[in-house]
């Protein structure tokens, strides 16, 4: 039997700070739900790691699974981990599953796990800082390159969320002259699991953009489209609902949101949105808008289609991998195309939208059972 170890450092830190789970965090929580009953928790900082006892692991997993923000309990877990850790223990068939990028740049992390007979398997979500550094904060490309290269050199296995991510990883490994470790592609399931119908949050046609406000998501472009819609159609223009926190390098978007008078009544910003409210926004949207320049996976795409909601998206390879020909695709800089499609989709009678609704019926929703089926079979191959 394989002994599973889960690094929960990022999850506990964010829970202690009262932060809502990100997409990466939700993956980590899914791994706890899958393996938590028999796994051990790991805490790490700058490559120094401790393995928690079974009792401390259960407590950590319970706090995370139930989103219990008990900072005192979290501090006790960390303190006990330093005293009661199994740092020098040797495990039979141990495998560390690390679902975030945090800490994968430290080679001593891999060495310490190897010293415990624990193989290291990391999930790679994207290589965007390397392939498109212009969309990231300064310096992120160097940090991410160190993470990826260290994993290529030392990891026993890698999990990617899409074939597109694996292809990018393979090209980067080839460019660096590094071998690609054993790997598996395992698609991620939508975070929204309930399909219960809820009442519409807005009595008007609207569209949703979902994701952190950052340059590669193309919010600035879409706000200009909306300004044109308002100029053309006035009060009858559809609404735009932006669900996501303000991120980095987005001052031009913030200027539009806060200072463009014509957008005041047409754009709604939801920076802290619960799963229930997000489901309501998506269920009744005319479409999800996904005009990104680049994505590693694109979870909102899968979430919208799983709810039966049409999608207007950039024509990205990873989107076609996840959704095939179901969405209506556009170039992320085709202003006239986006304007026309949004105006058409806003109408009560829209043949293009009706046709997509028919295509959605054949969408194959990724599930966690499928994901972990791929992962479990992969782990059995690691010797």
What residue spans do the PLM features occupy?
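Carbohydrate transferase catalytic cores enriched for Leloir-type hexosyltransferases
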Residues: 1-383
């Amino acid at each position: 039997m394989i002994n599973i170890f889960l690094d929960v450092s990022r999850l506990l830190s964010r829970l202690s700070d009262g932060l809502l789970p990100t997409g990466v965090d939700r993956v980590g929580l899914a791994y706890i739900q899958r393996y938590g009953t028999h796994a051990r928790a790991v805490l790490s900082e700058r490559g120094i790691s401790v393995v928690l006892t079974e009792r401390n692991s259960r407590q950590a997993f319970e706090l995370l699974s139930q989103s219990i923000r008990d900072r005192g309990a979290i501090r006790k877990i960390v303190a006990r981990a330093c005293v009661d850790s199994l740092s020098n223990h040797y495990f039979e068939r141990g495998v560390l599953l690390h679902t975030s990028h945090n800490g994968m740049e430290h080679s001593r992390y891999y060495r310490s796990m190897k010293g415990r007979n624990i193989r290291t398997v990391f999930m790679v979500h994207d290589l965007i800082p390397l392939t498109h550094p212009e969309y990231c904060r300064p310096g992120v490309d160097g940090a991410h390159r160190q993470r990826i290269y260290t994993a290529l050199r030392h990891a026993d296995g890698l999990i990617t969320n899409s074939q597109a991510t694996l292809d990018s990883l393979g090209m980067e490994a080839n460019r660096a002259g590094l071998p690609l470790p054993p790997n598996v592609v395992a698609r991620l399931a939508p975070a929204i699991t309930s399909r219960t119908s809820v009442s519409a949050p807005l009595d008007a046609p609207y569209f949703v953009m979902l994701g952190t406000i950052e340059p590669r998501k193309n919010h600035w472009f879409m706000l200009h489209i909306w300004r044109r819609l308002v100029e053309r159609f006035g009060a009858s223009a559809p609404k735009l609902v932006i669900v996501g926190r303000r991120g980095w390098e987005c001052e031009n978007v913030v200027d539009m949101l806060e200072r463009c008078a014509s957008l005041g009544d047409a754009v709604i910003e939801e920076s802290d949105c619960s799963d229930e409210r997000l489901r309501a926004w998506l269920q009744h949207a005319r479409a999800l808008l996904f005009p990104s320049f680049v994505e590693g996976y694109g979870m909102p795409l899968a979430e919208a289609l799983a709810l039966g909601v049409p999608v207007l998206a950039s024509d990205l390879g990873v989107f076609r991998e996840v959704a095939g020909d179901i969405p209506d695709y556009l170039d992320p800089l085709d202003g006239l195309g986006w304007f026309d499609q949004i105006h058409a989709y806003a109408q009560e009678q829209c043949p293009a939208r009706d046709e997509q609704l028919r295509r959605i019926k054949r969408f194959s929703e990724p599930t966690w059972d499928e994901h972990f089926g791929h992962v479990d079979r992969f782990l059995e191959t690691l010797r």
